[in-house]
Amino acid sequence: MSEVIERIQSAITGNRICIFMKGNRNFPMCGFSAATVQVFEELGVPYGTVDVLSDPELREEIKLYSNWPTIPQVYIDGKFIGGCDIVRELYETGELQELVKSALSQSA
């Protein structure tokens, strides 16, 4: 297993909610990343972020890992959820809140 894959898996398993994004939660570097962070800020839940702009190899590898071509990418409880549009859609229907609640209720 490559070192990049290990870092991806470590970020995903180390955070109940993990966002691979351009920039970071305090300074998103694209509108889609900013919109995704805003959803989780509105939910008021803990989440981790990984700045893909700081590591070009990781930026490309995460797309292969998830088989998803765009950034941001959201993982909840180790499962790939999707990007900005999917996260916003799930938020609007209430499904995201249920996924988050379930993931956070399992944390020790």
Where are these regions (language model features)?
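TIR-domain catalytic/interaction hotspot
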Residues: 6, 59-64
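Local sequence-structure signature of Cys/Sec-based thiol-disulfide redox active-site neighborhoods
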Residues: 9-46
